[in-house]
């Protein structure tokens, strides 16, 4: 059961590859909206769990974009030091 709860911390489902690419800011905005909705006391358990999974996917994708940006920055810094 606990493994299922943290399953969303892994890579998003394969069908996400077909989805249009979002920017880091768009992922963060989607995550903020999900958090706002999760605070709704009238949200059902099922809807809350679905929303949680979606939010975790948005977080994962935003983190990946941030990680890639950092790696690109590091690469540029290394190139600048050689020049």
Swiss-Prot record:
The keyword Transmembrane helix does not apply. One of its GO terms (cellular component) is cytoplasm. GO terms for molecular function: exodeoxyribonuclease VII activity. Residues 1-25 are annotated as: Disordered. Coiled coil: none annotated. It catalyses: Exonucleolytic cleavage in either 5'- to 3'- or 3'- to 5'-direction to yield nucleoside 5'-phosphates. Keywords: Cytoplasm, Exonuclease, Hydrolase, Nuclease. Its EC number is 3.1.11.6. The keyword Cytoplasm applies. It comes from the Bacteria. Pfam families: Exonuc_VII_S. SUPFAM superfamilies: XseB-like (SSF116842). InterPro entries: Exonuc_VII_S (IPR003761), Exonuc_VII_ssu_sf (IPR037004). Belongs to the XseB family. HAMAP family: Exonuc_7_S. Bidirectionally degrades single-stranded DNA into large acid-insoluble oligonucleotides, which are then degraded further into small acid-soluble oligonucleotides. Heterooligomer composed of large and small subunits. NCBIfam families: PRK14065.1 (NF010668), xseB (TIGR01280). This is Exodeoxyribonuclease 7 small subunit. It comes from Helicobacter pylori (strain P12). The lineage of its organism: Bacteria, Pseudomonadati, Campylobacterota, Epsilonproteobacteria, Campylobacterales. The gene is xseB.
């Amino acid at each position: 059961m606990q493994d299922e709860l943290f399953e969303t911390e892994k890579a998003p489902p394969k069908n996400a590859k077909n989805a249009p690419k979002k920017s880091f800011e768009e992922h963060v905005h989607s995550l903020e909206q999900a958090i706002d909705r999760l605070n709704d006391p009238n949200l059902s358990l099922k809807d809350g769990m679905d929303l949680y999974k979606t939010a975790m996917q948005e977080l994962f994708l935003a983190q990946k974009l941030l990680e890639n940006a950092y790696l690109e920055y590091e690469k540029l810094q290394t190139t600048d030091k050689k020049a």
